[in-house]
Amino acid sequence: MNYYIADTHFGCTNKYEDRTLEHDKLIKENWNRVVRNNVDTVYILGDIGREGSNKDNEYLCEIISTLRGRKVLIQGNHEGMKDARLRQLFVEITPYKEIIDNYNGLNHRLVLSHFPILFWASQHKGSILLHGHTHMTDEQKFFKKSINDLNEFFKDKTLKGYTDCPPARAFNVGCMLPYMNYTPRTLKEILKSGE
């Protein structure tokens, strides 16, 4: 089973989002409740945590090593991944990835990026963008509005090459979103969220 989550920010405290280290404990508990070890794959769409100093890296290694599943990191704006101890905790580290995930007997092409992208690979052929980065900010509201505007634009039947294309679908998998509830989610859960 594949799971998706972004913006865990382990080791970061933040007054803006009222985030304390208790969030780390909550995410870890939720993660290990749903993810099976050595069976499930978790795609972490960036900003996994605070890295840099030796102390920060040790804390991050400690947390990540206790999380179940095979971990694939899609790099965000906070990942330098210079520390070999951190890198070895992931089966793959990449800035962008396209995969196929199955839900309800259908294969779905997914584009995984930390950053929201207005135009992504095969979006008008039904591919789905999963992203993070924008948390629950005005940037996220703007991006959702942009996707809605784009879908309205492509309803114009006079546009060449875009007739009968499905609407663009993009989902923010930031852990702090209410439907994510600090828990890695399956594609089924994400699609049913209506986010």
Where are the model-predicted features located?
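A general structural motif
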Residues: 37-39, 68-70, 107, 125-126
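Conserved beta-sheet core of the metallophosphoesterase superfamily
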Residues: 87-195
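Short amphipathic alpha-helical segments and helix-helix/interface helices
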Residues: 32, 60-65, 96, 160
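Polar/charged alpha-helical tracts
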Residues: 25, 29, 58, 62-66, ...
